[in-house]
Amino acid sequence: MKVRIDKSVFTDAKDGNKQLELAFLLHIILYKNRYELKIEDGEVLGTDSFGKLMQSDRDTIEQIIAMDIVASSNSYDCVVKTGGDAEEVQKVFSAEEAILYLLQPYSVILENGLNDAHFMNAVFRLFDPTGILSHYQTEGWIRYENAGGCSNVKNFLQARIQQFGGKQKFLRCYVLLDGDKRYPTDTAPDVKYKTLKAQLGIWNVGYHVLEKRCMENYMPDEAIRAVAGTTYKDWADAYMTLSAEQKDFLDISEGFETDITREEKKTVRAKESLLMTKDKHRRKKSYVRGYLPQDEQNFYMSVSNGNFLHLEKGLKIKNFKVKFPETFGNSVVTYRANLLSRTSHQSDPLELSTIAQSILAAV
């Protein structure tokens, strides 16, 4: 992130506190090259405050000014200037505000900050060739935040804004939302996200809605096999018969039952119980399939009855939400090539790289 310090910050640093403020601001920006410092006005070199800085800081500023004379750019992510505290929307700050803003970790807001972190770590590790994102995450400069589901993202960000006196300019974050579609033509999530996406636009917050149902749907086939093992081999065998697109929208943990209503589930349970009472050895048929939305039934029409039965109730691994995502961190079964194979058919076949580059551009 490019941070420009205006000449006014140097000229106004006349007392001891302001001088310390300037020195601390420079330290935050320059420490371990976290941010890219920009100072265009060579006149700062003649200010009293510049002369009181550490020699290493003075040398750095002189080099920056010399380089900017050769290759000047007016594109900045953050501007620090006297009177910047009057701004509430644009990324313009006073020196005191800039310290608060730049000390914040960059927040990647997830629907489940703990479990989804494994997916994001894989994206950073495998789709950022610079290594910056993984480095920033290790340093604590990128933080995963738990929004508590998509319905709470707006409240989460509103609370963050209030922490900074109601100024939205203090938001430093990127929101990643599950696609939540049950099948490709499912419009319910689009309606659900419409208001949130509009508000994120107003707040100038970057976001991405996954093309697949959720992060679990990006798991490569090799990783699925490893997780299922021999215990859930029948489920895995059935899963492998699905097309790439069908895998995108399956609820892996809950199966198809999550796509019918509570009352429909009760009816299904009653029918299943009656069948088992009549003949425990009779081959069971799916009662769930007929209750799915017609578009979803059509989408999975190619799935045989036997395979549908295996997939119907999901992959019932104990502590699924904890254990399953951990496989994104297993480099033996989860790597760049097989993650790319899971997105090659999408509208954006490089979706994971798109996510990584969007965050990289902001930090």
Feature-to-residue mapping (PLM):
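Activity-critical C-terminal alpha-helical subdomain
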Residues: 191-310
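Glycine- and acidic-residue-rich phosphate-binding/metal-coordinating active-site segment common to enzymes
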Residues: 132-242
